């Protein structure tokens, strides 16, 4: 028969395995003090950035509100960049969504033509 020590060891190992499987296994890499120092450094960086932005805006003077800034122009360019979209369907899905796809594809050239006419 199995000794009591072996049974106890197996029970302890089993309990440890159960606890380990239910935890998120978070192991802190940094100490609490190190985390506080890093957060303080990040706050200082944020303050320096906001200060430099404020100084730059003071140097430029008042801007015309209707005139976009360089950052806004970059955002607009990124939003207007063409995007290719691909869809993979099997024959059953194609049969099911054929009417909707034909309607969408019929509308796509119209919206493209409207954008070109506006320019």
Swiss-Prot record:
Keyword Phosphoprotein annotated: no
Residue ranges of the region described as Disordered: 40-72
Pfam families documented for this protein: Motilin_assoc, Motilin_ghrelin
InterPro entries, per the entry: Motilin_assoc, Motilin_ghrelin, Promotilin
Signal peptide: 1-25
Reported function: Plays an important role in the regulation of interdigestive gastrointestinal motility and indirectly causes rhythmic contraction of duodenal and colonic smooth muscle.
Similarity comment: Belongs to the motilin family.
Protein name (Swiss-Prot/TrEMBL): Promotilin
Organism from which the protein derives: Sus scrofa
Phylogenetic lineage: Eukaryota, Metazoa, Chordata, Craniata, Vertebrata
Encoding gene per record: MLN
